[in-house]
Amino acid sequence: MDIHQILKLLPHRYPFLLVDRVNELERGKRILAIKNVTINEPFFTGHFPARPVMPGVLILEALAQAAGLLSFDMMGEAPGDDKVFYFVGIDGARFKRPVEPGDQLILDVELDRIKGGIYKFKGVARVGDSVACEAEIMCTMRTVA
């Protein structure tokens, strides 16, 4: 899935779109996506000027956006002004290595279960073979007026 397809499925835009490409998608099960991290990211201006590191919360957001792509694809729907996929919870977040400019963040997200309208995912973000972050992510679809 290229960036044009991603833009149809995610409502996020610059500077908050954190998925550049989907390399694998197993409908309703798993997604493998990437975020190319460059020195031009706006957050590097202040985090940290002498030693730029991608904020952990943005790594989690990238995993959540990949989960959103998996969910919208599974439902065969695109977001609209009346439907939003909200990030509602996180468990067991662990950060194992810094993510720096020039890294390619590999986002590996699996659907664990759906219960009571809450989608639970297991996500791992890697740089090469090294785990940068892992977490369980919860999201839900809401219709808004």
From Swiss-Prot:
<dbReference type="GO" id="GO:0009245">
    <property type="term" value="P:lipid A biosynthetic process"/>
</dbReference>
<dbReference type="GO" id="GO:0005737">
    <property type="term" value="C:cytoplasm"/>
</dbReference>
<protein>
    <recommendedName>
        <fullName>3-hydroxyacyl-[acyl-carrier-protein] dehydratase FabZ</fullName>
        <ecNumber>4.2.1.59</ecNumber>
    </recommendedName>
</protein>
<comment type="similarity">
    <text>Belongs to the thioester dehydratase family. FabZ subfamily.</text>
</comment>
<comment type="function">
    <text>Involved in unsaturated fatty acids biosynthesis. Catalyzes the dehydration of short chain beta-hydroxyacyl-ACPs and long chain saturated and unsaturated beta-hydroxyacyl-ACPs.</text>
</comment>
<keyword id="KW-0963">Cytoplasm</keyword>
<keyword id="KW-0441">Lipid A biosynthesis</keyword>
<dbReference type="GO" id="GO:0006633">
    <property type="term" value="P:fatty acid biosynthetic process"/>
</dbReference>
<dbReference type="GO" id="GO:0016020">
    <property type="term" value="C:membrane"/>
</dbReference>
<dbReference type="InterPro" id="IPR029069">
    <property type="entry name" value="HotDog_dom_sf"/>
</dbReference>
<feature type="active site">
    <location>
        <position position="47"/>
    </location>
</feature>
<dbReference type="InterPro" id="IPR013114">
    <property type="entry name" value="FabA_FabZ"/>
</dbReference>
<keyword id="KW-0456">Lyase</keyword>
<keyword id="KW-0444">Lipid biosynthesis</keyword>
<dbReference type="InterPro" id="IPR010084">
    <property type="entry name" value="FabZ"/>
</dbReference>
<keyword id="KW-0443">Lipid metabolism</keyword>
<dbReference type="Pfam" id="PF07977">
    <property type="entry name" value="FabA"/>
</dbReference>
<dbReference type="GO" id="GO:0019171">
    <property type="term" value="F:(3R)-hydroxyacyl-[acyl-carrier-protein] dehydratase activity"/>
</dbReference>
